[in-house]
Amino acid sequence: RDRSPSRGLGDVYKRQVNDAFSSDCECPICSMYKALEDDAVSYTMGPSYMEDDIRAVTDKKGFCQKHLKKVYDCENRLGFALVMKTHLDRVINDIESLQDGKVAGKSMFKKADKPAVTTYTERLEGTCFVCERIDNTFQRYLDTIFHMYKHDSDFREKYKACKGFCTKHYGILLEQAANSLKGDMLDEFIKTTNSLYIENMKRVRDDVEWFINKFDHKYIDEPWKNAKDSLVRAMIKDGSYIADEPGKRNNTR
């Protein structure tokens, strides 16, 4: 199946991918994900929460632990309260029905010995309105990376010049590459991506090591080199964690 981006929207995705790979960051894919995440959180606590069709989805899916905190941090207290009230109503009604056995049945059991309530709570734990809003567009970004690598020689050079990737997104790139690339192009992509990951992980590891050295009196007069922000960059490499900019919050109140 052709997973290349469609025209029109494809141009938007290409701009986002180009911008991310042109930026000075430890993982351009994390950078793209963070932008999508910020937009999705703002959307959740923007005017959309008053729309019945959107509220029906947030009522059903709720939020993961990470995005529950981010939605709360928007500081739209009334909006958050309304969303939480109707979501809690939905959960209470669903679980009361399951406790009473009104909707329990074989379809509610993954295993014969698993309570219907457990199946429900596990399913609820695995859904998040914000995550699911991000995921579809994020996959299109990944497809665009492979499409541009295959067809755009300038982008290939930009890809090879980036600072590598976090561990999570490195693994995703290797997993999905064969869906879009074949033969020598696939081999080159894998080789390049492997090198980018290892070389840049070592660079950040060495910066962290120098950060540690600076706490030894033997190195007190030595320059910091690139170590001052090494812990923040290590968090990106190891945990795909990009902190919000200081003073920046999604405020939709």
Question: Which residue stretches match the model-derived regions?
Answer:
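Single conserved hydrophobic/aromatic residue that forms the stacking wall/gate
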Residues: R1-Y13
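Short metal-coordination and nucleic-acid-contact micro-motifs, chiefly zinc-binding Cys/His arrays
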Residues: A20-S23, V57-K60, T121-L124, Y159-C162
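Short cysteine-rich clusters marking metal-coordination/redox-active sites
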Residues: C27-C30, C128-C131
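Short recognition patches in nucleic-acid-associated and regulatory proteins
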Residues: M32-R55, R133-E157
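Short cysteine/histidine-rich zinc-coordinating motifs and their immediately flanking basic loops
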Residues: D39-M45, C74-A81, R140-F146, Q176-K182
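Long, charge-rich alpha-helical interaction segments
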Residues: Q99-S107, T127, H169, M185, ...
